[in-house]
Amino acid sequence: MGMKHKTEILIDADRATVWRIFDDPDNMPKWQPTLRSFKHKSGTPGQPDAVSELVYDENGREVVMTETITARREPSFLGGTYDSKWASIVIVNHFEETDTGQTRWVSNANCRFKGFMKIMALFMRKSICYRTDADMNRFKLLVETELASNPS
């Protein structure tokens, strides 16, 4: 059972600022509130073949994901795989400059569910999509708030 999801958001900041904030793992809990820990395991952090462990608290249940960076073209593209016992997810993030100085963040996710999650995913599609949209909106708010607090 697979699911594809594309989310797009316009951020009122230049691409370099968006990338800087997105690329800093210390910022992740600020826009992914269920993230409990991020631990680098191997490779050069943030670069292709780097492996990290992310631990989330999903309604009292610990979900451990292994992130592997698959591609990076700073400041416009970051791709990775995220594996857990419930799913394998490929996420590709594009950051595009607009003519107005904003940044369009386009995220494409391709999920392959495992075990009983193959069945559960049928009922959870809306909540999974909502969660992605909410995380991206929190990131937008983080960037725009930081920019307003620390103008160049």
Specify the residue positions occupied by each region the protein language model found.
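Hydrophobic/aromatic beta-strand elements that line small-molecule binding cavities or substrate pockets
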Residues: 7-9, 40, 54, 65-70, ...
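Short loop segments at secondary-structure junctions
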Residues: 12-15, 73-74, 98-100
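Amphipathic alpha-helical segments that line or abut small-molecule/effector binding pockets
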Residues: 16-19, 133, 137
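Glycine-rich portal/gate segments that line the openings of hydrophobic small-molecule binding cavities
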Residues: 39-86, 134-152
